[in-house]
């Protein structure tokens, strides 16, 4: 598959390399500190901090369709027992046929287009964005006072609050119209129970569009 730095997460689209796994991070932090000397030997040191971190990681998602990852074990020569089939797959990897050894974006768009033509606009393949946003605040204040040559006092207070928001959004429908907010793994085990496959029981069979939240959405408060 070319050099030893093989990366299965990209493929060609419109003559350009497109990566399915893209990580973006934005992490601004503000810190304020105030020192007050009331008198000799007495110091009050107070500080506050605010941090707001945005983190996202994209990935392919699919439902009722072949695994689009080129390094999926069923696409490797070692998966097949038939020697002729093994040789054919070895040749594809050896010659680095990028339509096979890399993500085939054209096939993903085509699968969604065929679904639309069949009267179903739901995405077979899509690109999701996994978000992990963090809000963190802290406050502390420390008093140091010398009462005498042999007696010092140190006292302090501190507080901290953290909220982590975890959710997924639809980054790119790859030509589809929407994605159904259902659990594809639960659908395999409980196909006869429509309630068990829903990600949101309050909104069953919900259609989610680009930039919409789906799958999971919860906060961690510390």
Predicted regions and their residues:
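Glycine- and small hydrophobic-enriched segments that form the cores of compact globular domains
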Residues: 167-222
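Outer-membrane beta-barrel transmembrane strands
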Residues: 14-59, 122-160, 165-166, 208-222
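Acidic/polar loop-and-plug regions of large Gram-negative outer-membrane beta-barrel proteins
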Residues: 1-33, 56-128, 192-206
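Small-side-chain secondary-structure face that scaffolds active or pore-lining regions
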Residues: 70-82, 86, 164-183
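Generic detector of intrinsically disordered, low-complexity, polar/charged segments
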Residues: 8, 12, 44-46, 116-118, ...
């Amino acid at each position: 598959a070319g050099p030893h730095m093989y990366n299965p997460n990209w493929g060609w689209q419109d003559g350009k390399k497109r990566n399915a796994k893209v990580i973006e991070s934005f992490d601004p932090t503000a810190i304020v500190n105030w020192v007050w000397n009331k008198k000799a030997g007495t110091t009050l040191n107070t500080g506050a901090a605010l941090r707001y971190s945005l983190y996202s990681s994209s990935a392919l998602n699919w439902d009722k369709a072949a695994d689009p990852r080129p390094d999926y074990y069923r696409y490797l020569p070692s998966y097949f027992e038939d020697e002729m089939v093994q040789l054919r797959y070895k040749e594809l990897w050896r010659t680095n046929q990028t339509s096979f050894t890399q993500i085939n974006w054209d096939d993903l768009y085509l699968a969604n287009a065929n679904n639309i033509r069949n009267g179903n606009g739901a995405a077979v393949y899509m690109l999701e964005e996994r978000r992990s946003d963090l809000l963190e605040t802290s406050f502390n204040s420390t008093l140091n006072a010398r009462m005498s040559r042999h007696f010092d006092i140190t006292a302090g207070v501190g507080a901290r609050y953290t909220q982590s928001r975890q959710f997924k959004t639809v980054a790119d429908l790859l030509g589809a119209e929407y994605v159904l907010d259902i659990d594809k793994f639960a659908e395999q085990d409980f196909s006869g129970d429509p309630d068990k496959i829903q990600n949101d029981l309050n909104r069953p069979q919900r259609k989610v569009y680009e930039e919409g939240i789906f799958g999971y959405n919860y906060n961690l408060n510390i």
